[in-house]
């Protein structure tokens, strides 16, 4: 049995929209996803229970999860849409935020090999 950190919570795409003519950028994010990435980079086996869709934003999340060696729980990729957090920056530097997310994680069993369970943000 390999000891595992079991992480529960949102993964999303951070959309940063600066004032024109700056380009809008998109980055994988979400506090629980970031925790899973950090633990994996520290050498801990990590399993993530999250929700994202089979869409363009979901592919950003999936690529980030896979490139960091995080194990996804079954059905993590079955959401209708992938959550986004959009930050719009005004020319004076003020930011306004819009969150487009739902949280509908199905019932989960904590894996026997989990030595720690972390829930974050929306999951808590």
Task: Set out the residue ranges of the language-model regions.
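Conserved N-terminal subdomain of the carbohydrate kinase-like
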Residues: 45-121
């Amino acid at each position: 049995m390999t000891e595992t950190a079991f992480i529960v919570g949102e993964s999303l795409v951070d959309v940063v929209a600066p004032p024109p003519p700056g380009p809008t950028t998109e980055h994988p994010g979400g506090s629980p996803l970031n925790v899973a990435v950090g633990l994996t980079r520290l050498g801990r086996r990590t399993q993530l229970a999250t929700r994202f869709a089979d869409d363009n934003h979901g592919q950003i999340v999936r690529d980030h999860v896979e490139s960091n060696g995080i194990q996804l729980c079954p059905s993590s990729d079955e959401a209708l849409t992938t959550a986004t957090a959009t930050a719009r920056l005004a020319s004076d530097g003020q930011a306004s935020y819009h969150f487009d997310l739902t949280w509908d994680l199905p019932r989960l069993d904590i894996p026997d090999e989990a030595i720690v369970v972390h829930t974050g943000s929306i999951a808590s």
